[in-house]
């Protein structure tokens, strides 16, 4: 089951991906994974989530900080 933190990260990545006009297939190419991994990660039906390494790769590609994808320290977990 995805934790609240996992869901926060997934939602932030999806928001940024859509903001920049990048498809799930495009993000999959960046992460060298299948497009279905991205789709399942963004779905509530699967327990797929991004690794810390993947978040760093996403941040590098989007030219932002990995911290942009994580909740604040006072986040209710």
Regions found by a protein language model. Give the residues of each.
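A short, Lys/Arg-rich alpha-helix, primarily the initiator
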Residues: 1-20
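Short, charged recognition helix plus adjacent turn
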Residues: 3, 60, 68-77
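Conserved hydrophobic/aromatic packing and binding residues within compact polymer-binding modules
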Residues: 13, 27-28, 38-41, 69
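Alpha-helical residues within the helix-turn-helix
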Residues: 18, 29, 60
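Recognition helix of helix-turn-helix/homeodomain-like DNA-binding domains
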Residues: 32-49
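Short, basic-rich loop-to-helix N-cap that marks the start of a DNA-contacting helix
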Residues: 45-60
């Amino acid at each position: 089951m995805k934790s609240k933190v996992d869901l926060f990260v997934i939602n932030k990545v999806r928001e940024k991906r859509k903001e920049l006009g990048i498809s799930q297939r495009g993000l999959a190419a960046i992460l060298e994974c299948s497009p279905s991994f991205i789709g399942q990660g963004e779905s509530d039906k699967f327990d797929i989530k991004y690794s810390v390494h993947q978040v760093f790769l996403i941040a590098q590609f989007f030219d932002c900080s990995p911290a942009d994808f994580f909740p604040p320290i006072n986040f209710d977990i």
